[in-house]
Each structure stands twice: as structure tokens, then as C-alpha cells.
Amino acid sequence: MSIQIFNTLKREKEPFKPLKDGEVKMYVCGPTVYNYIHIGNARPIIVFDTVRRYFTYRGYDVKFVSNFTDVDDKLIRAANELKLTVPEVADRFIGAYFDDVDQLNVAKATVNPRVTENMDEIIQLISTLIEKGYAYESAGDVYFRTKKFKDYGKLSGQELSELQHGARVEYNERKQDELDFTLWKAAKPGEIFWESPFGNGRPGWHIECSALAKKYLGDTIDIHAGGQDLVFPHHEDEIAQSEAATGKTFAKYWMHNAFLNIDGEKMSKSLGNFITLHDVLKDNDPNVIRFFMLSVHYRKPITLNDAILEDAKNGLERLMIAYQNIDHRIQTDDGEYVEETHEDEWLEQLTELKQAFEDDMDDDFNTANAITTFHELAKRANIYLSKETVSINVLREFLSMMRLFAEVLGLKLENTQTDSLDDSEVEALIEERLQARNERNFARADEIRDILKEKDIILEDTAQGTRFRRG
């Protein structure tokens, strides 16, 4: 089965066919760096990092570009409030961005272009649109003639006659038509600006991504992605600008993730539930946050609350414990493993699980189903570990496959927080030890006791059951 992508432009799943065999050119809209990103921003970051990882796993050479908007009204306001320059604000929060997403195990982009470092390309694209009659100057501003682009609305499915722009596009008397949107803003007194043929000023939001995608990926790209809130007007405007300028298709596939809600409500400052990723990471394992984000298909809304995060923590721990148990069994190999008579059957099961995982990811990157398959792998690993005799070959294959699944999903199976086990991990091992003893697999029961002893955890078998204390 080939990779299937739900293409927002076509409103259906389509088989992925790259523009060039073996290569994927992918652009994801990045943050406006005037503050810490909110937890909702982390969803597209994690989702499309995972999409990229899977393409890499399938053998594609992925060129991944994600920008920083480092000048706009919000940055100017933040600079005034913090008594800093706009570049100083941008530098501060770009650094904070990398600090946060590095914890989430997000791979580095091929390029993270900053708007302010690519102003020549932005100005050139605006000039091209003016030359072709798709844009016009008005009192130092430059606007795009929306109605001249006949395909406008094709991404969002809206008709020109019914369109109403969102908050980022304001009506003013300088426009020839209320649907026209800004490409270049004339400088106001005291604001940062760049020189251009249209006068001193700075770019509008939408033109930035068109120019950066063109510079780093070319006139046509394979995949353009972002949150569903960007479909209109941002991505709709990008299509209009880019295709008007080049006469070519801007992006072949458009991918959009659904919203993250806080306790069932959309996150917003007015509701008082606006949470930054930076704050969430202070109290939560980033590995758990990543697992949580991938536990629901990216096109479905996801809800964040303490109970759901606890479920994610427990789900991830089950995978980690299975992995660590297998690894420990291999590391403590004393040469007493025997050739287990059903080795071929177990290896065949592993092959089937690998195929199931690939089928899940091929189906529009269904990480929720992929995690279910991952848990089935861990379950079978635990069953195998409880056997009296095992094959080192099967153990190594279990370990290799768990690493493979984790790498695609960007999860870490080692204990990343501390070398010690928390109470739930200890209790899971105690339960596994009890099962081993009931099955008269005393070698495995003793092995679990040794694992816990290495972590300074002492077991005490009592009439009421097994208790533990930390040494």
C-alpha cells in the first residue's frame, strides 16, 4: 500500500506521488516569535515532524522548511512592552522555541528561515505581482487584487461572492476592494522598516511564506502543512500570491491538523485557558506530551486535561517497561539461552506487526492506530519474556522493532527523566513478577527482583502481598 494523504485541496485521501522520485519537499508554517508558543502550536510541530520521520523511514530524502515570522505587529508591541528592539525579542523567543521543541525530540528542519533575513526575495515577489497586474500600490501600502485570481477560495471551498476575511485582514479606504489583502505595509513613525521600491515598510504576513517556500523549495512543492486555522485566509492567500506570480501549482498536497482543546474548550485568552508549551514542560515529561499528541489522529480534535495526560503517561510507561525488560534480558545474557522451538513463529508475528504498523502510517499517518500496534508489540514481548526458555534472536528482533517504531514516532523508550523508577513502573514490574511466579517461571521472577535491586528498590513478600521500599 502506498502512502495515502488527506489533501485539504481535494477534500479526500490521495496516494502520495512526489514531484521527483525519492524526494519530498515540505513546508510547514512556523511561529510568530513574540512570546513562548502555546501548547496548541505544539500539535502541528509534533505531527508534521512525525510525518517527516515516516517519509524518511520509507526511504525519501525530505527537505523540510519551517519559517520564523520575526517582524509583525505583535513583535512590535512586545518590543515596546519589554523595552527591547524587535530583533532582540525575536532572538529571545526563537531561542526559547528551540529549547522547548528540542525537549519534544523534534528533528531540526533543513532550514528555519527568518523573514527579516529574506527581505530581498519578499520584495521581488511583490514586484512580480505588481508587474503582472495582481497587486497595486496605495499610499505606501501594496495590496493583492483578490478578485483577479479566479481560483481564489479553492482551498477553503468558499466562493468569492461569499468571502469574509478573518481578523488578520482589515478593511481600509486604501483598498480598491474590501477583499484585497496586504502584501506590504507602509512604515509608521518609530517602527522598524525596510527600504523597497514601494517605500519604507515591512511585509504582510501571507507574502512571507510564499517567498520563503519559493526560495528554499522552488515554485512547486510536494506538501504544505499547518493547523486548520491557517486554511483561510493564510493558506488561501499563499496560493493566490504564489500561483499568480509563477503560473504554476504552488503545492500538490495540503495537510492540516485539527485543534487542541483544553477540557473540551478551544484554547483562548478570553477563556483564561491559554497555556504555553514552556509552562506545560515545567510539570510534564516531554516524552509524555509527544505521546499524547500522537494518540489521536491529527485530523481529529484532541483534548488536554490532567486525566488524559495521566492516561498518556501510563500508556507510554507500558511501552518503556517492555522495552527496558527486553534490553535488560539481552544485556544480562549469560549464555544459557536455548534455541526456542517456536522461534520462526515468533519472528513471523513480528513481521506481521511491522506490516501492520506501516499500514497504519500509510493510512494518512494514523499515529493513533500505530500506537495501538505498538502496544500489541509490547504485549507480545511481555508474553515472550514470561516463557521459561527464549531465543536471543527473537529478543533482539523485539528490541529492534520497538526501537524502529519509537524512532518513527519520535518517542524515547529509555527512562529520560531519571535512572530511578517511579511507583507505577515499580508496581507494573511487581505484577509481572507475580505472574511469572504463578507460572512457575522462577528465573524470570528472580530477574525482575534483580532489576529492581539495581534501582535500589527492595521487595518484601508478605502475607498481604509484595510491598516495596526504596533503599
From Swiss-Prot:
Catalytic activity line of the entry: tRNA(Cys) + L-cysteine + ATP = L-cysteinyl-tRNA(Cys) + AMP + diphosphate
E.C. number(s) listed in UniProt: 6.1.1.16
Source organism superkingdom: Bacteria
SMART domains listed in its UniProt record: DALR_2
Catalytic EC class: ligase
Binding annotation for ATP: 269
Keywords annotated in UniProt: Aminoacyl-tRNA synthetase, ATP-binding, Cytoplasm, Ligase, Metal-binding, Nucleotide-binding, Protein biosynthesis, Zinc
Protein name: Cysteine--tRNA ligase
Source species of the chain: Listeria innocua serovar 6a (strain ATCC BAA-680 / CLIP 11262)
Classification of source organism: Bacteria, Bacillati, Bacillota, Bacilli, Bacillales
The gene coding this protein: cysS
